[in-house]
Amino acid sequence: MMVAHTAQQLDLREKLLTNGVHSLSDIELLAVFISSGNNKKSCLQLAYELTKHLGNLRNILNADLQSFKSIHGLGEVRYAQLQAAKEICHRSDFIDLQKEIQLSNTQQTYAFLKKRLRDYKNETFAALFLDSQHRIIAYEELFSGTINTATVYPRPIVERVLQLNAAALILAHNHPSGLSDASQQDFAITERIRDALDLVDARLLDHIVIGDNEVYSIFAENKWVCN
């Protein structure tokens, strides 16, 4: 049985190397990642069971350890590798964003923030810190809360602005509900942070709310915030 499983693995790798990674199905990609099966299941069978259990690649990437381990033959090592691969992709996206001499590509910024934040199960508050030319200094996730709220304090944000010598920043947070509409609390904290940044001559450029499929720009939709 193991000989047959090994042949399957080699066939998949050969297909990838010959025809390119885009020629593989989602299950085949997972099988290449899983790499090896066990005495009872091939890597392809494990990939099929994982997909059947969790539904799609996005769900698999965002699954918790217990859900991942519920497939017999998959454990902590593969889960850790999967999370590492996911983070590598995130950091690669950030490198692409940093290549912008100035942060003028709004859609690219939205796409980056959406990819980083939308799959978190708890509300997470983040910031892009920028220099005076609106070049990116850092991306940091600053506060994390429950499924429907995160307590946000302006003071640590201002302190981080001073530490990084940032001249401007873009705030973002996710709504685990999937809805991107801003709440009254979102408007209130935006104004508090904007006022706090004014005291240190830093500018708040926007506050983005991340839903499942959409983003909401508080500044674009509510010009009063910019005044």
Swiss-Prot record:
Family: Belongs to the UPF0758 family.
Keywords: Hydrolase, Metal-binding, Metalloprotease, Protease, Zinc
Gene Ontology biological process terms in this record: proteolysis
SUPFAM superfamilies reported in the protein's UniProt record: RuvA domain 2-like (SSF47781)
Entry-linked Pfam families: RadC, UPF0758_N
Protein name in UniProt: UPF0758 protein LPC_1989
Locus of motif JAMM motif: 173-186
Ligand binding (Zn(2+)): 173, 175, 186
Molecular function in Gene Ontology: metal ion binding; metallopeptidase activity
Residue ranges annotated for the MPN domain, each copy included: 102-225
Entries under PROSITE patterns matching the protein: MPN, UPF0758
